[in-house]
């Protein structure tokens, strides 16, 4: 699958942009090591897998969008490192909210210490973020206030994205119609989150490249497509925890009473969402098609003409990473 990543970039610049991705990720790790240096917790050097293209798909997409917007190389690398900080913040918060652990920082903490590892990921990512921003401002002769503004802008973007999560704590009182889930919940939760990589460039790229607006629109659609797929995977969990879920809303408001009844019965019986979709293949096919069309529209708008043949493979890769769902 790495060939998909390599092919995102023009052939003459493939190795250069791959190197930029690696340089940005390695810069994040260097700064994280400096933050933890001589402390009680030690950073473990990242594995090749954690720095691989296949583990950093969205980072590669965002880097591609910066390249397409003709942002200079030095700042592209800088933004890759910034985005890794945002990734650490978002993943750490998601881990705590979902009671799981997806690694963003390798340390010598016990593997089972999921909650504290997530807390540490958040603290280190936030510290590295401000370190990167303040160092950049110093190098460019900009006042420290600019770094503070950029840091606050990141917080604002992530807080706007996370607000729907807060509204779900304690459980939702009603299941919104599917269109309302997209406009009132997923718009913020995922659509705007996928635009967050442009928050810092919006301050440092003046004037903003004309291609930036299209890149943000395409990222938004990619994000919504991802969220629909994610909702397919998390259908039973979200129903059990009384969370908003686009798929649940489609079934509750747009399908037969039998389908909704079957869903209500199935989610607490040890069945998987896959079992439910197997019993209702039409629902699964329509939802997967909608998600894939959203992904393909976003990727198609992002990719340059020579790379349009990669839209389908890239969308399929995303779908497989989210839940192993076979695109329909």
Language-model-derived ranges and their functions:
Residues 1-108, 163-179, 315-328:
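Conserved N-terminal diphosphate/IPP-binding helix and adjacent helical/loop segment
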Residues 20-37, 49-61, 119-229, 236-239:
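All-alpha helical catalytic cores of prenyl diphosphate-utilizing isoprenoid enzymes
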Residues 43-50, 111-118, 181-186, 278-286:
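A ubiquitous short alpha-helical element
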Residues 64, 91-113, 125, 167, ...:
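Acidic, Mg2+-coordinating active-site segments of isoprenoid diphosphate-utilizing enzymes
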Residues 81, 88, 115-124:
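Helix-rich alpha-solenoid scaffolding regions
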Residues 90-93, 133, 197, 226-229, ...:
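A structural signal for well-ordered alpha-helices, especially hydrophobic packing surfaces
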Residues 123-146, 254-305:
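Primarily interfacial, aromatic-capped hydrophobic alpha-helices that serve as membrane anchors
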Residues 288-328:
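Short hairpin/turn module used for nucleic-acid contact or packing/dimerization
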């Amino acid at each position: 699958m790495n060939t998909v990543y390599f092919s995102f970039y023009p052939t003459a610049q493939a190795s250069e942009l791959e190197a930029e991705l690696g340089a940005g990720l390695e810069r994040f790790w260097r700064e994280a090591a400096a933050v933890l240096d001589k402390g009680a917790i030690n950073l473990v050097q990242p594995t090749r897998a954690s720095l691989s293209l296949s583990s950093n798909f969205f980072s590669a997409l965002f880097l591609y969008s910066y390249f397409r917007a003709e942002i200079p190389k030095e700042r592209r690398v800088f933004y890759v490192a910034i985005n890794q900080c945002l990734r650490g913040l978002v993943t750490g918060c998601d881990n705590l909210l979902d009671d799981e652990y997806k690694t963003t920082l390798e340390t010598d903490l016990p593997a089972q210490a999921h909650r504290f590892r997530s807390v540490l990921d958040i603290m280190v990512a936030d510290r590295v973020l401000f370190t990167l921003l303040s160092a950049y401002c110093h190098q460019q002769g900009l006042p420290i206030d600019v770094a503070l503004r950029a840091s606050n802008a990141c917080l604002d973007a992530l807080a706007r994205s996370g607000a729907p999560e807060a509204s779900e704590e304690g459980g939702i009182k009603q299941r919104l119609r599917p269109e309302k889930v997209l406009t009132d919940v997923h718009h913020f939760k995922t659509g705007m989150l996928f635009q967050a990589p442009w928050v810092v460039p919006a301050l440092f790229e003046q004037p903003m490249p004309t291609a930036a607006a299209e890149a943000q629109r395409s990222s938004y659609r990619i994000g919504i497509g991802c969220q629909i797929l994610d909702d397919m995977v998390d259908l039973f969990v979200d129903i059990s925890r009384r969370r908003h879920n686009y798929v649940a809303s489609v079934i509750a408001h747009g399908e037969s009473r039998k389908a909704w009844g079957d869903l209500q019965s199935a989610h607490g019986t040890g069945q998987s969402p896959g079992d439910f979709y197997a019993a209702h293949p039409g629902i699964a096919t329509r939802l997967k098609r909608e998600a894939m069309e959203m992904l393909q529209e976003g990727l198609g708008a992002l990719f340059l003409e020579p790379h349009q043949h990669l839209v389908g493979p890239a969308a399929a890769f995303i779908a497989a990473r989210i839940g192993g769902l076979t695109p329909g």
